[in-house]
A protein has these predicted regions:
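Core nucleotide-handling region used for phosphoryl-transfer chemistry
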Residues: 1-155
């Protein structure tokens, strides 16, 4: 049985949420909070990828983290012993999603679709070492060759 749940989002009335249109094979809209004005309401917009026409959600990155003191202030009736807290792992989050419009898997980082770009956009040390794109690193993390087409990846 193949069932699917569809979510939509309406961020047009939320202040301090940036809307970025992105076109690859099809069009996407990426919703991100404004880092200078992040609030508890906008923190859920760390990176949401939607269909720009229907607002169907394709990818929803975990919301912005909060400090223990902020959490305790917001939820004073919850005891610390009921939760496990982990250290934040720094790095670029890569989100995998399925786009039913084109029947393909795709990846997104916070600000773009596809992963065909580098963490270091320029070479500062002059060695011009070859860099792997986020897409290539993602493929290698799954045990595939860096140039494998997503259509040939068992997900």
């Amino acid at each position: 049985m193949n069932s699917q749940i569809q979510f939509t989002v309406n961020a047009s009335s939320v202040q301090n949420v940036q809307h970025k249109n992105y076109t690859k094979e099809v069009s996407y809209e990426i919703l991100n909070y404004d880092p200078a004005n992040v609030t508890s309401d906008t923190g859920i917009y760390r990176s949401i990828v939607v269909n720009p026409d229907t607002k169907e959600v394709f990818s929803f990155a975990p919301p912005k983290s909060t400090t223990l003191s902020e959490f305790a202030e917001k939820f004073p009736c919850i005891e610390d012993s009921r939760f496990q807290m982990n250290e934040i792992i720094e790095g670029t989050m890569v989100n995998l999603f399925y786009d039913s419009r084109i029947s393909k898997w795709e990846i997104a980082t916070k600000g773009a679709i596809g992963g065909n770009y580098w963490y270091y956009r320029n070479s500062y040390d002059g060695d011009n070492k070859p860099q792997l794109t986020f897409r290539q690193m993602f493929l290698e993390s799954l045990g595939y060759d860096k140039n494998t087409d997503f259509a040939n990846v068992e997900l």
